[in-house]
Design a protein with these regions (language model features):
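Periplasmic c-type cytochrome electron-transfer domains
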Residues: 1-379
Length: 379
């Protein structure tokens, strides 16, 4: 199994367990025991420099676009655990064409060539704005920046590469003090047309809201005065935000040839392991309680209370503590968007299954976990 354009899937689990621990032993321990013995393997992931934070792009993207290079930091997750570069683009209006990216990164220089004839003029204008640079906290023309040279800024599609994700990281803008801010793993925009909440914790109610407010404040760590100094991009709701949102709403999930129209496996196409994994997903694994078919999201927020498993502490500048409710992200196409969880701490689907096996206390055995991963790869 590969990602949509052929990149091999990373395989785990990758977490290093404490001496004397095994996944089987951990799954039999209570949250209190795991917390007391300090053996939880999936603590929140800090920013590479948590005290400074800010947008940070992968090495493969920086090599392609040197304007995104920071002089103070390099990305911390190996390319093997990141989405393919560049990712495919699927449109709800052109399902017959499959990937319309032509294997290219969509930019201001090529967007018209790639999409003229596929989009109407309004959608083309929305896409143009999505690939246009605007000032941002770390990338701007003032002396207060993290790029060597003055910068015109970043584009929406620098993080949401080709309407998917580059796995760029940042710190959420809505928490203070700095040490309490959570790391953010850029989510895909595929399938935003079926989503009703936006932002991992802020619960914005429309893609229009998110598109407009992201550049007014989140681009600048939620600091409105800094935004004014560096160049806030005030988008007009009717003739800019609407156009950008309309294009984003065309971004489709990747094909899932083994799923039927209800989002379940077609038993004539699926393997025995995948069928067993689906049964676990909708029963013992408890996955379906938050991730129902066909898109595998309930469009709600849930508090997993992961703090049951660790003591509050400072790790690499981040004060880890109770994180509160997090948006339920769709699992359709999940194999294309590692790493996982809101901060990217889970590098593979195997890590994700191990994490939830502990957090949900489902006590799955080795075969059940392998089958569940096999099912997730087909979504």
């Amino acid at each position: 199994v590969t990602m949509s354009r052929g990149k091999p899937l990373p395989v785990g689990p990758t977490a290093r367990l404490k001496d004397g621990m095994s996944w089987e032993k951990l799954s039999t321990m209570t949250p209190e025991d795991i917390k007391e013995k300090n053996v939880f393997p999936y603590l929140p992931l800090p920013h590479p420099n948590h005290a400074t934070g800010g947008m940070l792009f992968s090495q493969i993207q920086v090599e392609k676009f040197p304007r995104l290079k920071r002089f103070d930091l390099d990305f911390d997750i190996p390319e093997y655990f990141l989405p393919e570069f560049p990712p495919a683009i699927f449109l709800t209006t052109h399902k017959d064409k499959g990937d319309v990216s032509q294997g290219k990164v969509v930019t201001l220089e090529n967007y018209y060539e790639l999409f003229n004839g596929l989009l109407n003029p309004k959608q083309l204008e929305g896409l143009r704005l999505l690939v246009t640079q605007f000032p941002q906290q770390q990338f701007n023309a003032t002396a207060d920046r993290k790029s060597e040279k003055p910068s015109q800024g970043v584009t929406c599609f620098d993080c949401h590469l080709n309407g998917h994700t580059s796995a760029a990281t940042h710190l959420v803008g809505d928490i203070r003090p700095q040490s309490h801010r959570n790391r953010l793993d850029t989510p895909t925009l595929r399938g935003v047309n079926i989503q009703r909440l936006f932002g991992s914790q802020r619960a914005l109610k429309s893609i229009e809201d998110f598109t407009e407010f992201e550049q007014r404040a989140a681009y600048f760590d939620g600091d409105i005065l800094t935004a004014i100094k560096k160049g806030t991009n005030i988008l007009e709701r009717g003739s800019q935000v609407h156009f950008m949102a309309e294009f984003q709403s065309l971004l489709d999930f990747p094909p899932a040839p083994k799923l039927d129209i209800f989002g379940r496996l077609d038993t004539k196409k699926a393997t025995d392991s995948e069928i067993r994994g689906q049964a676990i997903f909708f029963s013992k694994g408890k996955c379906f309680k938050c991730h129902p078919a066909p898109y595998y999201t309930d469009n709600l927020m849930h508090d997993l209370q992961v703090e049951r498993f660790y003591k509050p502490q400072v790790i690499n500048g981040q004060y880890i503590r109770a994180e509160g409710p997090i948006k339920t992200f769709p699992l359709r196409g999940i194999k294309d968007s590692p790493p996982y969880l809101h901060d990217g701490r889970l590098l593979t689907l195997e890590d994700t299954v191990e994490f939830f096996n502990l957090v949900l206390e489902t006590n799955l055995n080795v075969e059940e976990k392998n089958d569940l991963v096999a099912f997730l790869r087909q979504l």
